[in-house]
């Protein structure tokens, strides 16, 4: 029931009560003798109850001293229904009486069920219902009092009092209440023919139970007591009333409980608001908090919110779910074995390392390996991010560190994992820009003390992950705190095969997962575990978008293009001249790489725009080379410059499309000259650049810098000359490939073989492209067979020679 409907019902009930009261008073003064029947409906019982209370107000007021006069309220069915749990059921029964028939039997069965269930009294449910009833009952009481306040007492002016009440002699006595209001009590049996104005109605009939000689009918404001007495005395003198018959005046101090209650309403509201704010602060009014963790109460800001996993938790990750980092997994498993079987190591006098730092590029599986440790260890695992220690308030970081290790010691043996520890573990005072004493340093100092300081206890193993070990404080990396640094690199081709097998098990493929895992592993060199998971998910999305029932190799190739090059934009507006320029540019890359010995084998070339700036690209399948020779880097430079050379030779104009190629060439050539020591003029010197690019001064002189710049220009010019000569030799083939690109937009290696023929260079070992076509396990078996045959042939030859 809404408050608006309740207020409207009360207003209608008040009007009907006045009409009913007029009918009870017997038609005096033009009051209507009857009132229309009360409307029945959803609020019928409430309106009838309020009407009965207001209509009999006079009877209750006169008999307030008699407790029995309230019995009619307690005996009222509507009154009892307000405070009964069965009100809704009875009300529902009334509303359903209109629809007889099948509903009768259901009502009887429901009433039996409800009566049987009502016998079981639930204290907590009753308390909850009582709390829910407080606010509606309080509001209902205020509305009831406001409705009952509109009584028959009439406010008049002093002039009306003088002319219409005092002059005819109708005033019995006056009661001045609270020195502000004069209540006029009219005689019980006045002479009605002396009343001159019909606007004031005095009733001679009495209601049942009223025996007082006078009744309180009128009131007016007096302003002040002295002025009121003077006015009244002057009025009585003017009327020539005998002083012995002056109207008696009494003064009272009345406390109207409704007004007194209303005085405290603002205070109660303020207290209630403060209480609600307090509850909100404890439950929801928060400060900080990581994603998925919610916020922190302002009163518990020093406490740390830890993700705690135990052996009974669901959605565990095990070591079998981690692939591509076998060596790192083996080292982490030693911690788990020690926690499960500590006696085996203690008998040999060994101590478990206090901590291990997981180091590696982003997406290699550091956090996943920590989750697997939590699932396999069988001990409490507490996980937190390094940024969760930092807050806007001073001293919160150290407090949270203490709270974290205190909780870990309470449930020892346990494992604590701090992800992205570089947020609090940066070197203190590095470079003179960090300030003397900040919140991060205080947090780091507290972490150092908790890991290895006075008062530390055994049983807590600390794991941490970071991709920036070079910026960590040396005190944090020393033995006794992080005894081990476990490096997790990007997986090789076999590691990628294992990772693909894990993710492909969850997909619906048209062939076996091993078929795809081998070929996709060869197709994705340099991909980390997170990139592989993204490729598998993108392939599933592309298959679903194309209404496919199974995922095929075409979907995986499109997913790899999406991850490498960005979103495909076939609707991008490109002019014919620009499209032709892009086609010749990409064909120049393809031809240059095809006829260079140390260049990477080409997978496909396309002129479909992708990403934000790429109008086309050539995709290669590089090998997982750990070392690069000078000749390999030179051929890669020539292949990168093939696009610019094709534009100059075939179109006669150069464009800005080679900007990215020139950037790669510049970076590659500077590395050869200044880092790898390939230049004879610079010598065997290496000047590696910092990754952050922040250097106040160069580690070499200006003369050396000039030599480096000159060498880089000469090397790039030499590579460009060779590339131009190569493009001129195969000018017709470049044009054919460009026309095919304009026609098909995408060319694979098979299409290039038809135009260019087989590559003139053969490698002794299979390339990643060969593994992509055939699968590397078959190649390994064939290679082992060839080696065994070669060994047998050599031994046979030696025997014959002997």
Swiss-Prot record:
Query: At the top level of its lineage, which domain of life is listed?
Result: Eukaryota
What one GO molecular function would you report for this record? zinc ion binding
- Compositional bias, Basic and acidic residues, is annotated for 85-113
Q: Which stretches are tagged as biased composition: Low complexity?
A: 1-23
| Annotated Zn(2+) binding sites | 585, 589, 661
Q: Which organism is it from?
A: Oryza sativa subsp. japonica
| Task performed by this protein | Probable ATP-dependent zinc metallopeptidase.
- What cofactor(s) does the depicted protein rely on? Zn(2+)
Where in this protein does the record put region Disordered?
1-33, 85-120, 773-802
Where in the sequence is the transit peptide found? Answer: 1-21
Gene name tied to this protein: FTSH3
Give the membrane topology: Single-pass membrane protein
At the top of the EC hierarchy, this enzyme's class is: hydrolase
Q: What is this protein called?
A: ATP-dependent zinc metalloprotease FTSH 3, mitochondrial
Q: Which InterPro entries match?
A: AAA+_ATPase (IPR003593), AAA_lid_3 (IPR041569), ATP-dep_Zn_Metalloprotease (IPR050928), ATPase_AAA_core (IPR003959), ATPase_AAA_CS (IPR003960), FtsH (IPR005936), P-loop_NTPase (IPR027417), Pept_M41_FtsH_extracell (IPR011546)
**Gene3D superfamilies assigned:** 1.10.8.60, 3.40.1690.20, P-loop containing nucleotide triphosphate hydrolases, Peptidase M41
Q: What Enzyme Commission number does this protein have?
A: 3.4.24.-
Name the lineage: Eukaryota, Viridiplantae, Streptophyta, Embryophyta, Tracheophyta
Instruction: State the PROSITE patterns in the record.
Output: AAA
User: Which residues does ATP bind?
Assistant: 360-367
Compartment list: Mitochondrion inner membrane
> Which residue windows are transmembrane per the record?
133-153
The family assignment reads: In the N-terminal section; belongs to the AAA ATPase family. In the C-terminal section; belongs to the peptidase M41 family.
- Principal subcellular localisation of the protein: mitochondrion
Coiled-coil regions listed: none
The UniProt keyword set, sorted, is: ATP-binding, Hydrolase, Membrane, Metal-binding, Metalloprotease, Mitochondrion, Mitochondrion inner membrane, Nucleotide-binding, Protease, Transit peptide, Transmembrane, Transmembrane helix, Zinc
